[in-house]
């Protein structure tokens, strides 16, 4: 019985107060989630793998929460180092345990149970070297014909899947990184200082594969090294995990650990050992920022590739093409030599980068390795690890040529590749297999490297911890009205969609993002900050402007950010309360990445609202199917799901239509249709009357005409000055 309810029976509370308190208590901006896992294990699974017998000096119960510092206490107890925390929690020195303690291996049934409860599936994509044998059939035939040896029948599809499944021991706690996998003490402290306590599903499954159960550094011998090189080689990994599940941490920890071991074995040698490729500059800056937090005090340097950075040694003049040497006369040849020599002197003045990990977009690195396309791509023989973040985009036709050129430039025989994304099609898997095989044949490698696929949850599905709303708005004016209702909610009932700032708004094109920003610029009152609370971000802005907008949005100075698919992938905004798809995405994968900007690290309460009009109806079914799959995974009640009649009524797209939609977007909103007056009226983002638009166009035309007249007058003045006779020269 609720005592507060009994005591306030005669008091009429305002509905807005009740609604606001209930809504604000479950928002992503309210703080971090207690458990970052999307598919947490049951209580029975949590106790598995733990010791029943307590060690001497160990407490009966472990604290479930991080200790809160006493700000008013003495100075000696105000702060506590991570090492002291581990001593206080476990009652012994965790570092000593990591060097001398032995971890018992987990039984296979227990490993299977944990991986299944967290919805983790690992598959070896190599063809199994064995075949299934039917003993009854082979026995009968061997009696009749002893001389003839028959081959065993091929594996069935079910047997093949069972043979390819892997069940490695999962990482149940970040403490085991030090005790079992023997990572650096400094790296372990950096992980603890960032507040990482419980590994997410992708970290639980991928870190054991990438780190391996290596012996401790002081116990390693030559025999151990040879055994590890043969039986415990790091695999090529293809990971499909939900958005916001911690993929960056999953590939950065093994990279840093491997580079620190390389520095220990080769002191004084500085070279590029790992490359991380991402599709956007914003994602590159984010990865560098997270990497620098983890590498503090480790001696590992993480840098972003900038224009003009010198990555490889200067190549000789013999790489110039024969056409440049043979074309033209002697004077042109000598001038070309002077130009090349001056360029060579300038490049020699730029110091060679001393970074261990380079993070870049594909075009910047490809241009740096080929001098802007003037030469062949220079090899990178020292790179031992290549990571493709958002690999499905990097291997899409837009970036494929640049990404593959970087991949082929990494000529180290022990190169390992990691492909990470929330969506991964079968075509990307086939391209990965063919590229690895082609590279092995080119380098003459005989041993086939293992390629493992790790899938968390349902493949190509939106995260289940947010609510999805598909809203029919009929026209562009209806979408504007619906968006303003989200900005200024009037109803307090729980049935309506509540969306509190900060949130993102996605549009199809840059022009539409700019138009929507100008339309909503003054919707927030001046008392709350006015137009400074709404901003627009797209690729045509300068780098400094883009970084300023990103910084303002992270600080909370900007509440509503209007953007294109530039921010749809990888960028981590942990406190975003929702996402609005003002224009429907071009594909189901784009929808998964857009709505994944909210609900990061298991945060509940995020909302994804998608508006669609009459022109969008032929393209909505793919998005509706993704929403339906996410609702099934979440266990949404029947009344809150997308109705089945809507899924049945929406038309399906052909393969060619899907390709056109992915490449060009919805036909009615493509830039090529702007010239059509009828279509442009339907898709115009504006509430201005025709008279106001005509007056604006006249004013803009007058300004342009004035600028043209000034330019023409200035040109005439320069010509008249040249025509003036200055007399006879002395």
UniProtKB/Swiss-Prot annotation:
One of its GO terms (molecular function) is RNA helicase activity. The keyword RNA-binding applies. Its EC number is 3.6.4.13. InterPro entries: DDX52/Rok1_DEADc, DEAD/DEAH_box_helicase_dom, Helicase_ATP-bd, Helicase_C-like, P-loop_NTPase. GO terms for biological process: maturation of SSU-rRNA. A motif (DEAD box) lies at residues 389-392. Residues 700-711 have a biased composition (Basic residues). Disulfide bonds: none annotated. Residues 15-112, 130-156, 211-233, 312-348, 661-730 are annotated as: Disordered. Residues 228-442 form the Helicase ATP-binding domain. Residues 15-25 have a biased composition (Low complexity). It holds the Pfam family Helicase_C. It is found in: Nucleus, Nucleolus. It is an enzyme of class 3 (hydrolase). Its main location: nucleus. One of its GO terms (cellular component) is nucleolus. It catalyses: ATP + H2O = ADP + phosphate + H(+). Interacts with the U3 snoRNA and is associated with the 90S and 40S pre-ribosomes. ATP-dependent RNA helicase involved in 40S ribosomal subunit biogenesis. Required for the processing and cleavage of 35S pre-rRNA at sites A0, A1, and A2, leading to mature 18S rRNA. This is ATP-dependent RNA helicase ROK1. The gene is ROK1.
